[in-house]
Amino acid sequence: MKAERLEMLLLCVYRLGYILPVDVCIKIISVAQVSVQGRSTYSCKRRARSIGRCWRCYRVYPPVCNSKCDNRTCRPGISPNFKVVTFIRGWSN
């Protein structure tokens, strides 16, 4: 989260530094809220579709060969990829 704020600050200073003083840019960044990814099922499905995974079991979907995933009644396996689960569920780092 700190990296996002620093990136936003640098972008603000770079873009608005010649119009606004740096102190005003820092004040804007300190008041601004960091946007949070949605946690609804729609947003989970959207993120899963963007990386080609099932939003319920985190397997590759559509399956390459015979798979336990039908995208309706599937369940997560014993050890799903934690990075994929974190991305699909929208958990922050």
Curated annotation (Swiss-Prot):
Entry's InterPro entries? Carla-bd (IPR002568)
Does this UniProt record's set of keywords contain Zinc?
Answer: yes
| Single GO term (MF) | DNA binding
One GO biological-process annotation of the entry reads: symbiont-mediated suppression of host innate immune response
Q: Which UniProt keywords apply?
A: DNA-binding, Host-virus interaction, Inhibition of host innate immune response by virus, Metal-binding, Suppressor of RNA silencing, Viral immunoevasion, Zinc, Zinc-finger
Q: Where are the zinc fingers (C4-type)?
A: 54-69
Please give the family membership noted in the entry.
Answer: Belongs to the carlaviruses nucleic acid-binding protein family.
Q: What is this protein called?
A: RNA silencing suppressor
> Which Pfam family, any one, appears in the UniProt record?
Carla_C4
Region named Basic: 44-47
As for what it does, the entry says: Suppressor of viral-induced RNA silencing. The potential mechanism of action is based on sequestering siRNAs.
**Which superkingdom does the taxonomy of this entry point to?**
Viruses
> Is Manganese there in the keyword field?
no
Disulfide bridges in this chain: none
